[in-house]
Amino acid sequence: GNDPIAGCIGCGACAATGRCFRQDGVNDFVERAREADGFIFGSPVHYASASGAIASFLDRVFMCGGRQGVFVRKPAASIVSARRAGTTATLDQLNRYIAFHHMPMVPSLYWNMVYGSNPDEVRRDEEGMQIMRMLGENMAWMMRAFALAREAGIEEPQYEPKIKTPKNR
């Protein structure tokens, strides 16, 4: 939506309560994420990085939901849109959320990016549109494969809680 999302202040309240103390869409998303089979996170490129809104949102979503294991082994991908440059840096930024939370990253034919200043220009980016179509196909396939594995009784690897190196080393 268009509602403002404040950034994470690192207070740790979500570690104790399972919810962010801020009352906005983040807690609702984390609750819905529990039932989701997969995720695609997207952003326009702003100064060779993700928009402040998506960065604030994902910081808080993964700080709160990540601590609860909400995203573990749920397929995910990042997509970005730019007028010209900064896409790979932005993808790297978004992909870190996925990689740091045990989420299988869904592939496509190339980097998950499109180019254009407006929707019409993006639709004319034939390569980018093909990448998005293949990403959607691969996402659907991976989610079906995971569901079939669960139905067949194939055990998931054991999840290990994250070990944190003490700060005073």
Placement of each model-derived feature along the sequence:
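Glycine-rich phosphate/pyrophosphate-binding loop and the adjoining helix
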Residues: 104-169
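Electropositive phosphate-/nucleotide-binding environments in soluble metabolic enzymes
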Residues: 5, 23, 51, 88, ...
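Short secondary-structure capping/turn micro-motifs that flank functional sites
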Residues: 3-4, 49, 114-115
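Cysteine-cluster motifs in flexible loop/terminal segments that predominantly coordinate metals
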Residues: 2-33, 160-169
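Short secondary-structure transition/capping segments
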Residues: 6-10, 53-54, 117-121
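Helix-loop-strand module that forms the ligand-binding subsite of alpha/beta enzymes
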Residues: 21-110
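Short, structured secondary-structure boundary patches
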Residues: 15-20, 54, 60-66, 120-133
